[in-house]
Amino acid sequence: MRRFWIFNHYATTPLTGPLLRHFYFAEYLKEKGIETTVFAANELHQTGGCVDTHGKPYLRTEEEGVPFVFVKTSKYEGNGISRVKNMVSFFLGLLKISKGYAKQYGKPDVIMGSSAHPLECLHGNLLLDLTA
């Protein structure tokens, strides 16, 4: 089976928020026989909510057959420096967990960095060796 990873800082599941484009895209790819995992921050954008990672670097959940990985990030409020720190913590957290996640669940064939902010696209480039 082919594996496809989607990196989007603000992606949510139907249970965690309204930003579902990546969830629905993953469902569509699953119907086509492509195992798709969505990676997102555990601090939920525009809701003030947070997915508890239980003190671990990430929490893997599955909703309606779509694996979601919530990466532990710093809390933020508004559009100030705390939000920039949150973006950086997602970037660094995702880099930190990716190789171990690939070892445990299988390497991706494709990585898509969905551009929520400038750091998002760098993930795919920096993790190209995972697809080799």
Identify the residue ranges that each predicted region occupies.
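A conserved catalytic-core segment of Leloir-type glycosyltransferases
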Residues: V38-Y105
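N-terminal subdomain of nucleotide-sugar transferases
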Residues: M1-E64
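A general structural motif
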Residues: M1, G33, K107-P108, A132
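An aromatic- and histidine-rich active-site surface loop
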Residues: P14, V84-G93, S98, P108-T131
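Short glycine-/acidic-enriched loop or helix-start segments at secondary-structure transitions
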Residues: T16-G17, G48-G49, G80, C121-G124
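Intrinsic disorder/low-complexity signature
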Residues: L19, G106-D109
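Short, solvent-exposed loop/turn segments at secondary-structure junctions
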Residues: A11-T12, E43-L44, K75-Y76, H117-L119
